[in-house]
Structure formats: structure tokens, C-alpha cells
């Protein structure tokens, strides 16, 4: 039980995929203008990342390693991730059309989100079992969602302020991301790397 808590804590806060591993920066900067879109993207990514982490373990342990096909790892993981994202898109279009429209092009781009593929590959590299893999994916996705929603809140607040001209837009967003990253550095003492 302690190992599961450690995995969740370290992936969500200490080794955050966005702020420490620099994975998923495209949706981090692109979808973080509105909190609603950030929450939707975070939830969709959480579902995809958790399923992809478990599916990547199954593909690796049940197909690639026994058949000595590990050279097909990246290709097979991309296919698995693409199938999961297509499933999410169909479900979201049916159940939440407003959210589907708000996410726009970023929803199909979860397929190419380097955070999803990166977490799947890191999961395999660290040699987790199935339960640990699912928790590793969920923790990474929770950290991604947490950072995305906090950053969206910061950007919404900044949009209401009068920012000096040279800092308006992307510069103030990068400065805010740096400050957020420094704040998350405070979690570094909670768990060893």
C-alpha cells in the first residue's frame, strides 16, 4: 500500500510530467487559456494516460517480450494510444458535445501528446507490474491535470490584469509557467527520485 502511495505522490507532484520531465508542453500552453477547457483536456488525458499505461504494460509483457518484438515498442504503443483516443473522442462527442467542441483539435492530438507516449515508455523502463503501471499512469495524468488547471487559472487571472506590452501574451505565460515550476520544486523533498 505504501508503494502505491509513493508512486502516486512522486508522479503527481515530485516528478510531474510537465514541470519536471517537460512532456506535454503543447497542450499545457495551448489549452490553458480557459479553465473549463483545461479541466476537460485534463480529464480526457487522465483517462487516456491511465488506460495507455495499463495497455502498454500488457502489450509489452504479453506480446512484445515473449515474441522478442521489442523493436516494435514505439509503433505498437502509438497504435494502442491512437485506438484509446479514438474511443474517447467518440464517447465525448456523444456525451459532452460542448466539451468536444471546446477541446477542438487538441482532443485528437492527445494521440501525439508526448506525455502519453512518454509515460508509457517510462512505465516500461521502470519495470512496474500491471497495478503499478495503472497507478503510475493515473498519477502522471493527475499531475498533468493539476498543473494544467492551475496554469489555466493563472492565465485567466492574468487576462484580466493590465500586463505591460512587451510581456503580454506568450512572455507572461512562460514567466508564469516558470513560477509554477518553482512552486512545484517545493515538493522535491517529499519523495526520493
Swiss-Prot record:
Listed Pfam families: Rnf-Nqr (PF02508)
Q: Key word NAD present in the record?
A: no
Source domain of life is: Bacteria
Keywords carried by this UniProt record: Electron transport, Membrane, Nitrogen fixation, Translocase, Transmembrane, Transmembrane helix, Transport
Where does the signal peptide begin and end?
Answer: none
InterPro entries per record:
Ion_transpt_RnfA/RsxA, NqrDE/RnfAE, NqrDE/RnfAE_oxidrdctase
* GO cellular component term of the entry, any: plasma membrane-derived chromatophore membrane
| Entry EC number(s) | 7.-.-.-
Q: How does the UniProt record describe the way this protein sits in the membrane? A: Multi-pass membrane protein
Q: Does the keyword Transmembrane apply?
A: yes
Per the record, the GO terms for biological process are: electron transport chain; nitrogen fixation
- Which stretches are transmembrane? 4-24, 39-59, 71-91, 102-122, 134-154, 167-187
Record's subcellular location: Cellular chromatophore membrane
Give the protein family: Belongs to the NqrDE/RnfAE family.
PANTHER family tied to this protein: INTEGRAL MEMBRANE PROTEIN OF SOXR-REDUCING COMPLEX, ION-TRANSLOCATING OXIDOREDUCTASE COMPLEX SUBUNIT A
Enumerate the NCBIfam families for this protein.
PRK05151.1, rnfA
Q: How does it assemble?
A: The complex is composed of six subunits: RnfA, RnfB, RnfC, RnfD, RnfE and RnfG.
This chain's function reads: Part of a membrane-bound complex that couples electron transfer with translocation of ions across the membrane.
Any idea what this protein is called? Ion-translocating oxidoreductase complex subunit A
* Organism of origin: Cereibacter sphaeroides (strain ATCC 17023 / DSM 158 / JCM 6121 / CCUG 31486 / LMG 2827 / NBRC 12203 / NCIMB 8253 / ATH 2.4.1.)
Amino acid at each position: 500500500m505504501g508503494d502505491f502511495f509513493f508512486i502516486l505522490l512522486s508522479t503527481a507532484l515530485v516528478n510531474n510530467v510537465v514541470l519536471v520531465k517537460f512532456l506535454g508542453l503543447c497542450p499545457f500552453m495551448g489549452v490553458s487559456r480557459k479553465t473549463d477547457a483545461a479541466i476537460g483536456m485534463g480529464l480526457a488525458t487522465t483517462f487516456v494516460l491511465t488506460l495507455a499505461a495499463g495497455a502498454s504494460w500488457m502489450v509489452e509483457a504479453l506480446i512484445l517480450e515473449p515474441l522478442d518484438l521489442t523493436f516494435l515498442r514505439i509503433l505498437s504503443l502509438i497504435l494502442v494510444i491512437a485506438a484509446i483516443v479514438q474511443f474517447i473522442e467518440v464517447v465525448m462527442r456523444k456525451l459532452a458535445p460542448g466539451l468536444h467542441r471546446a477541446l477542438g483539435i487538441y482532443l485528437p492530438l492527445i494521440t501525439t501528446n508526448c506525455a502519453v507516449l512518454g509515460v508509457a515508455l517510462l512505465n516500461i523502463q521502470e519495470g512496474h507490474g500491471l497495478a503499478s503501471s495503472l497507478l503510475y499512469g493515473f498519477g502522471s495524468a493527475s499531475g498533468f491535470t493539476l498543473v494544467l488547471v492551475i496554469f489555466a487559472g493563472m492565465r485567466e487571472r492574468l487576462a484580466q490584469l493590465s500586463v505591460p506590452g512587451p510581456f503580454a501574451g506568450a512572455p507572461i505565460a512562460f514567466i508564469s509557467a516558470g513560477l509554477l515550476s518553482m512552486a512545484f520544486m517545493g515538493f522535491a523533498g517529499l519523495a526520493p527520485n
